Amino acid sequence: MSNGIVAKRYAVALFKIAKEKHVLEMFEEELRLVQNVFTKNGELHSFLTQPNISKEQKKTFLANVFASVSESILNTLYILIDNKRIDILPEIANEYVVLANEERNVADATVYSIRLLSEEEKLNIAEAFAKKTGKDAIRVKNVVDEDLLGGIKVRIGNRIYDGSLQGKLARIQRELMKNR
């Protein structure tokens, strides 16, 4: 079975527990924290995938490192260790966020711009794209892309809204080529 399918199953199980306990936000924050630690620390990943280190040692280590997370998240980490699936943790976190966003009718947007946007600009973009997408809210993450000449590009899910100067120039060029 592919890692994506397995990750989705774990995410769905966590999502059901979170809904039952009314802790969608808390689980999301904890999963993002754990995901962040895993992706930024290659030594942690190496330690947890080392076959000569016992599962109990790995679990004790996880309990110490992630003492602040809920029992459900910690137990999920233990199960991943037992099933030798700890490497799919980032995918599980991403799948969980998708499920939680769907439940709350929220979307995550990555906004590419030539400079950091102010909070007011982020808010305006979030409001405009919430209306455009039919979502209750949009959470904006700003990424500076110095290759843009001007304007912004917004990525929500697998859709890209290109309001950059480069995008406009490319559309004009296509239009001119089409009319030849």
UniProtKB/Swiss-Prot annotation:
HAMAP family per record: ATP_synth_delta_bact
Xref: PROSITE patterns: ATPASE_DELTA (PS00389)
Membrane topology: Peripheral membrane protein
Functional summary from the UniProt entry: F(1)F(0) ATP synthase produces ATP from ADP in the presence of a proton or sodium gradient. F-type ATPases consist of two structural domains, F(1) containing the extramembraneous catalytic core and F(0) containing the membrane proton channel, linked together by a central stalk and a peripheral stalk. During catalysis, ATP synthesis in the catalytic domain of F(1) is coupled via a rotary mechanism of the central stalk subunits to proton translocation.
Protein name: ATP synthase subunit delta
This protein's record includes keyword Nucleotide-binding: no
GO molecular function per UniProt: proton-transporting ATP synthase activity, rotational mechanism
Statement: the UniProt record of this protein carries the keyword Protein transport: no
Subunit: F-type ATPases have 2 components, F(1) - the catalytic core - and F(0) - the membrane proton channel. F(1) has five subunits: alpha(3), beta(3), gamma(1), delta(1), epsilon(1). F(0) has three main subunits: a(1), b(2) and c(10-14). The alpha and beta chains form an alternating ring which encloses part of the gamma chain. F(1) is attached to F(0) by a central stalk formed by the gamma and epsilon chains, while a peripheral stalk is formed by the delta and b chains.
Gene: atpH
Cell location: Cell membrane
Domain of life: Bacteria
Pfam families: OSCP
SUPFAM superfamilies hit by this protein: N-terminal domain of the delta subunit of the F1F0-ATP synthase
Organismal lineage: Bacteria, Bacillati, Bacillota, Bacilli, Bacillales
Keywords: ATP synthesis, Cell membrane, CF(1), Hydrogen ion transport, Ion transport, Membrane, Transport
GO CC annotation terms, alphabetical: plasma membrane; proton-transporting ATP synthase complex
Family assignment from sequence similarity: Belongs to the ATPase delta chain family.
